[in-house]
């Protein structure tokens, strides 16, 4: 059954972003699902931890075998400050799992507390991204091709974490809730081998009465061929130090394409 769900997720993702290769030369496509045995050592539940800082260490380095996609983590003063953690935690209980100690929980309306079927299309695992660029530094989560070869990141699926959704709706001691007329956006910026920007794609991630609560397709194909993509979160919800929302989100089923040799 798990294998069938994995295949279904791959087919669904490939179909959603099929236009990435239309009218082009012979292309190869892979969907990075974060499922299977090669990912098991990196899943947060293997560490018995629900908090990014308890999982992400300098030795926490994963790489997809089919595409060489990897996600280097950023540390400041010895502490995790931005990057990715593979997770399977999912819940609809914002009161219990809506603070920073459970920042690895993705929102799933169907489960009160589970470590299965929280990913896109009922899969089990996904990435939790954390970090942004601000006056305090550049801590944007980055997806990079470790072999340095440029590929097209056609798209992925995004969802809210319980932590983000709880603060967006209810606020907390460090951030107000999203008010009428305010919004939060996520951005993906592509870079070529020379470090030049290839473009930026922006999605409205949350407004007062319109928040992402399910896996939602995000088309990144306009970035073109890239060696890395940096993700950012911005918005006009602020405290005295600037943007105040938790800079967390989930992504899954990253579709990658490259020219066949």
Language-model segments: residues:
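Terminal, low-complexity interaction segments
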Residues: 180-261
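Short coil-to-beta strand junction motifs in C2/discoidin
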Residues: 167-186
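Short edge beta-strand/loop segments characteristic of extracellular beta-sandwich folds
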Residues: 157-159, 175-176
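Short, T/G/N/S-enriched strand-turn elements that build extracellular solenoid repeat scaffolds
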Residues: 141-144, 219
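Extended extracellular/luminal ectodomain segments enriched in beta-structured repeat modules
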Residues: 148-155, 225-226
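N-terminal targeting leaders for non-cytosolic proteins
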Residues: 27-140, 148
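Generic short beta-strand segments
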Residues: 158-164, 232-237
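Bacterial Sec-dependent N-terminal signal peptides
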Residues: 3-6, 14-41, 258-261
């Amino acid at each position: 059954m798990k294998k069938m769900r994995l295949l279904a997720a791959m087919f669904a993702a490939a179909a959603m972003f099929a236009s990435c290769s239309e009218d082009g030369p012979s292309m190869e496509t892979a969907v990075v699902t974060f499922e299977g045995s090669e990912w098991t050592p990196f899943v947060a539940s293997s560490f018995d931890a629900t908090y990014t800082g308890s999982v992400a260490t300098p030795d926490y380095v994963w790489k997809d075998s089919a595409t060489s996609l990897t996600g280097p983590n950023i540390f400041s003063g010895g502490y995790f400050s931005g990057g990715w953690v593979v997770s399977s935690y999912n819940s609809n209980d914002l009161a219990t799992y809506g603070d920073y100690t459970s920042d690895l929980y993705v929102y799933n309306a169907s489960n009160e507390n589970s470590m299965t079927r929280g990913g896109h299309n009922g899969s089990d695992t996904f990435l939790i991204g954390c970090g942004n660029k601000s006056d305090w530094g550049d801590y944007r989560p980055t997806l990079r091709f470790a072999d340095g070869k440029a590929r097209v990141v056609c798209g992925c699926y995004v969802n809210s974490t319980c932590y983000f959704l709880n603060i967006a709706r209810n606020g907390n001691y460090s951030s107000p809730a999203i008010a009428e007329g305010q919004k939060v956006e996520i951005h993906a910026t592509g870079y070529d081998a020379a470090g030049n920007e290839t473009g930026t794609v922006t999605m409205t991630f949350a407004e007062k009465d319109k928040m992402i609560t399910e896996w939602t397709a995000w088309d990144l194909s306009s970035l073109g061929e890239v060696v890395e993509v940096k993700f950012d979160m911005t918005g006009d919800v602020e405290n005295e130090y600037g943007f105040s929302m938790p800079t967390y989100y989930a992504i899954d089923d990253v579709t990658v394409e490259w020219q066949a040799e």
